[in-house]
Amino acid sequence: RKPATLRMIGLLPIVRNKAFDMVSDGHEFKVWIPGKNRFVIGRNDAPLTVSKQPLENMRPQDIYDALLIPVIDAQNEIAVVENGYETVLDSRRHRVEQPDYELVVVRRGQKNWFLSRRIVFSRTDMKPHRQLIYNEDGQVRTEAHYEKYTDYDSVSFPAQVVITRPIEGYDITLGMVKLEINKPLTNDQFELEQPAGADVVHLGQEIGGLAAAAGASPQRR
């Protein structure tokens, strides 16, 4: 829900048990991991601390930015279109170089301007098929692939989105079974209560609005 509210529930393959449940208001987030009995609370802008448990590394805002490509921020970003090439497989599974258009986005950082995003458009359909998001050190934070574009209520959207987070060591493949756009949503659809007896983990020290509902003694990272 605009501007940056997200609720996502992940299911395990085959058994279809809940792997995680996450919610974010764009600033703070909560993630419930039933298999580990962990309830993680933090801010989307908290410094990254990589956990050995990949599910604990998930941040709703990272998924949101990969799933819905952000618009160019005219105040803090400069975008330039370049001609480029990407390696694809042809009908015979041979690797070939295919020309594309690449939207290079440079962003104002804390100290200097840096390469923030690279969005790759196919010359065949003029749709974005790949997005690379970088941190200020030049590392790839997110790589997203958008495939199988389909019309949903006259809106073209990829039926498959693959999101990879190489630093944290996890990836998510989203397959659209059903997509409803611009449907009314209620506030309770974005509420995630702390389960009784859950092991609570607070990321960072400053916890505000979303975390107020979690009343257990937290662990901190």
Regions found by a protein language model. Name each.
Residues V15-K18, D73-A74, Y152, G169:
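Short beta-strands and strand-coil junctions in structured, solvent-facing domains, enriched
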Residues P13, L67-L68, I72, I181, ...:
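Residue-level marker of positions within ordered structural domains that often coincide
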Residues A79-A196, V201:
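Gly/Pro-enriched, hydrophobic low-complexity segments
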Residues K2-D65, A198:
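An acidic-aromatic
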Residues R1-K2, S24, F121, D151:
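Generic beta-strand structural signal
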Residues K36-G109:
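A charged, solvent-exposed segment within the mature domains of Sec-exported extracytoplasmic proteins
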Residues Q189-R221:
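Gram-negative outer-membrane assembly/targeting C-terminal domains
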